UniProtKB/Swiss-Prot annotation:
Name of this protein: Maltoporin
Gene Ontology cellular component list: cell outer membrane; pore complex
Family to which the UniProt record says this protein belongs: Belongs to the porin LamB (TC 1.B.3) family.
Topology relative to the membrane: Multi-pass membrane protein
Signal peptide: 1-25
Function: Involved in the transport of maltose and maltodextrins.
Keywords: Cell outer membrane, Ion transport, Membrane, Porin, Signal, Sugar transport, Transmembrane, Transmembrane beta strand, Transport
Highest rank taxon of the organism: Bacteria
């Protein structure tokens, strides 16, 4: 009886918590893609999806789980706590964790899976007297990301740990300001010493929702990357730290509604480390602080999803980017890519999708010589989805793909155990978001 009496208060507290409406108010969101596939030489072999499209060109399992809850709401003031973690297993086995797998050779030890903390932040509204509609936030966050879905290409995305004020009404549009940390980490290249990442802070200012003509709006923004090496890094023999310069990235995005779909045209210009963002399909969250003093670049992007009658929809991407004088000996790096994904709807749940993509990269040196890579990917997929829309998910796809390089001065022969310029893939993939 004493034991029973001891547990009664605890049981009552648990019951009260479960009965509370707030206990069930957790927002649950997420994303995943996963599947299985083979190629002409073992498991799937891919070609840069940002350049030629992602359909039938992804060999990973990737998942995000997001949990959030409004923890306070009183007198027009709210506080919301948001969180997200992500996992990337390689998909080769049942049990895939972060522990080491050595394959009988200590020099080949690696984990089956990577775990990442993507978001943990607080978002508050109603606290700013001059802008009660605005959101005051701090923590690690996905911040106003701009991307092209068919290629998984994020072209404006400074997400990370930071703070800011978002959505201040100013005339016809809204202003947002953020301070986010985007360190330049070591990748074994460009003269950086191992484990010596450099502190980089990004200041981001945006004005969004500017109305133009019918169904058209404009968003403009500026990002300023502040290179912040330590005194020890400045005094080191590594000239990359001494030469690191602050950089500016300017972005303008025009959105036009078309037949229930949309088309976006994006113009971007970057100086110093942002020159590499323009040339190498960067998003602004990675700053190439080691770029040569005076480097710059620009990028033009057009993308969208447009309905074509009752049975057809098409997604598309056009990208042209240039980086100038990014390192000693570099004159100009040019990149171009085009992707199209037409889709035919047989009924509300059954689709046939084709995706074709082509890219070309050219690296011109100051001595007049140049190196070129170019290639393409073709995919045909039979798809079943929860609805007929281009964006309907979950979706299950059976696909076959062919990928090939035309020019391969820099890429070499990446397929079939480094002996071939082309490959084919066959597989099944699921994708969902909620």
């Amino acid at each position: 009886m004493k034991m029973k009496a001891k547990w009664l208060p605890i049981a009552a507290a648990v019951t009260a918590a479960l009965a509370s409406q707030a206990a069930f108010a957790v927002d649950f969101h997420g994303y995943f893609r996963s599947g299985v596939g083979v190629s002409s030489d073992g498991d799937m072999q891919t070609l840069s999806k940002q350049k030629v499209g992602r359909l039938g060109n992804e060999d990973d399992t990737y998942g995000e789980v997001q949990l959030g809850q409004e923890v306070f709401n009183k007198d027009g003031k709210t506080f919301y706590v948001d969180s997200m973690f992500a996992m990337i297993p390689n998909g080769s086995n049942d049990w895939e964790g972060t522990g080491s797998v050595c394959n009988f050779d200590e020099k080949q030890c690696s984990g089956d899976s990577e775990f990442a903390l993507r978001q943990f932040n607080v978002q508050a509204k109603g606290l700013l007297g001059f802008a009660p509609e605005a959101t005051l936030w701090a923590g690690k966050r996905y911040y106003q990301r701009h991307d092209i879905h068919i290629s998984d290409f994020y072209y404006w995305n400074i997400s990370g740990a930071g703070a800011g004020i978002e959505g201040v009404q100013a005339g016809p549009g809204k202003i947002s300001f953020a301070w986010v940390r985007n360190d330049r980490g070591w990748d074994g290249k460009d003269g950086w010493t191992k484990f010596e990442g450099m502190d980089v802070n990004t200041l981001d200012l945006r004005y969004a929702g500017i109305p133009l003509w019918q169904d058209a709006s404009l968003e403009v923004g500026v990002d300023y990357a502040i290179a912040n090496p330590t005194d020890a890094q400045k005094d080191s023999s590594n000239v990359q730290y001494k030469n690191a310069k602050d950089g500016v990235m300017l972005t303008a995005e025009l959105t036009q509604g078309i037949f229930g779909g949309f088309n976006k045209t994006v113009l971007q210009y970057g100086t110093e480390g942002y020159s590499k963002t323009m040339a190498f399909y960067g998003d602004g969250s990675w700053y190439g602080a080691e770029a040569k003093d005076g480097a710059d670049g620009f990028r033009i992007i057009n993308h969208g999803v447009i309905p074509m009658g009752n049975s057809w929809e098409m997604g598309h991407q056009l990208v042209y980017g240039v980086g100038n004088d990014m390192w000693d000996g570099n004159d100009k790096w040019e990149t171009m890519s085009v992707v199209a994904r037409p889709m035919y709807k047989w009924d509300d749940f059954n689709k046939t999708i084709f995706e074709g993509g082509y890219f070309k990269d050219k690296n011109k040196s100051t001595n007049g010589s140049s190196l070129e890579d170019s290639g393409y990917k073709l995919t045909l997929s039979q798809t079943w989805s929860a609805g007929s829309s281009f964006w309907a998910r979950p979706e299950i796809r059976v696909f076959t793909s062919y990928a090939a390089l035309d020019d391969n001065d820099m890429a070499g022969t990446p397929y079939n155990s480094k002996t071939s310029k082309d490959t084919w893939n066959f597989g099944v993939q699921a994708e969902a978001w909620w």
